[in-house]
């Protein structure tokens, strides 16, 4: 609905221009309303250029990818790191940091991760790993089990009895 305050086009416009002004509800509509589709070839090229420390090429690729897929957390994190390493683009770094923070806050506000019923909701496996890193979970020391959920797949991460539940959703209408 174009007149709705939660119209995705309006929210996306605000997110791209002044992400810090997004409220938490808008951020959730944006994160869960836009399905990230990753171009594997472009993503691999971005990783290759980033590993070579070609920051200029990485930024060109990353920003082009974000114009097509603005909620791709993995690409946003690479672009942020490039600007951080350049140390002369604090405005751009702040902009992408605000976008990243709003999307992560949307994931964190989706649940507490303590049960299936209150599992964190994420749009992709890469977002799941980003969330786990933010929660300071060492996935190498944890055991993961998976089981189907109504919306996608539950991943249950067990760290010596301390479990974190994440629901990787395939398609969610928010």
Which residues make up each language-model segment?
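Residue-level signature for tetratricopeptide repeat
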Residues: 48-49, 65, 80-84
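N-terminal alpha-helical interaction modules that lie
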Residues: 1-61, 115-174
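TPR/TPR-like (Sel1-like) alpha-helical repeat modules
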Residues: 84-108, 136
């Amino acid at each position: 609905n174009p007149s709705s305050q939660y119209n995705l086009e309006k929210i996306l416009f605000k997110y791209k221009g002044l992400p810090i002004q997004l409220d938490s509800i808008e951020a959730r509509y944006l994160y869960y309303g836009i399905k990230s589709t990753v171009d594997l070839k472009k993503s691999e090229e971005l990783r290759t250029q980033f590993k070579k420390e070609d920051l200029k090429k990485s930024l060109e690729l990353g920003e082009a990818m974000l114009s097509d897929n603005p909620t791709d957390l993995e690409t946003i994190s690479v672009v942020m790191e490039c600007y951080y390493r350049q140390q002369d683009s604090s405005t751009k770094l702040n902009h992408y940091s605000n976008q990243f923070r709003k999307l992560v806050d949307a994931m964190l506000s989706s649940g507490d991760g303590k049960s299936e019923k209150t599992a964190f909701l994420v749009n992709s496996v890469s977002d799941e790993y980003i969330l786990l890193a933010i929660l300071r979970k060492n996935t190498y020391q944890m055991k993961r089990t998976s089981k189907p959920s109504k919306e996608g797949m539950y991943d249950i991460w067990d760290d010596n009895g301390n479990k974190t539940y994440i629901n990787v959703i395939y398609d969610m209408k928010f």
